[in-house]
């Protein structure tokens, strides 16, 4: 979701949107083939046995843990805010600020670089500050950024302030994502697969919910995007 708009914008210079869907179909076929040919690298003696029954038991064990459930909800709401940005930013840049698909992809690419940079910084400071501190800082940054973006949309701020706000807001995903995941997995190393599945489901489920909500107000307003972002960000703080 971060790199795809940048690549798609460049492809539109040479092709049409129909070709992009053909490329997606080809990549999907390659992934399907790869999944069929992929061989498990973990030695048999270290693999978790029990199949679906064990996995289901692990899921219930994890969900009953209030701390793990709390981190799952943080993933749900925080990624909800992030995917609201993913879903709505093209409308903001192209329909409100009248940028071309290529210009939008450049700005989106800059934000992607910011996300990578924030991830590198997070790794550097992880020995100095705790995961909880990183998580708290990033969620506050996400909330403040979302609020500023909503204000910017209401009062029709120009492009540069809006772009700056979205840059620092988008950077938080690599901070709260890794910190929350680390905190959730602390007690459940032996259930890493099940825990990772729940956390991944939480973030992707949020994406499925917020994406259509962002477009409810039409293509020429960013207010629904801002409202969705601030609501999700504020709930992640709870």
Predicted segments with their positions:
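Helix-loop-helix hairpin linking two adjacent transmembrane segments in secondary transporters
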Residues: 1-38, 106
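Interfacial helix-cap and linker-helix signal at transmembrane-aqueous boundaries
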Residues: 6-15, 93-94, 125-126, 213-222
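Juxtamembrane intracellular "pre-TM" segments in multi-pass secondary transporters
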Residues: 41-72
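Pair of pore-lining "gating" transmembrane helices in MFS-fold secondary transporters
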Residues: 64-84, 167-171
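Small-residue hotspots at the loop-to-helix junctions and early N-terminal turns
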Residues: 101-109, 196-197, 226
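Helix-to-loop junctions at the C-terminal end of transmembrane segments
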Residues: 118-132
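C-terminal transmembrane helical hairpin of 12-TM major facilitator-type secondary transporters
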Residues: 133-179
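A late C-terminal transmembrane helix in Major Facilitator Superfamily
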Residues: 182-223, 228-229
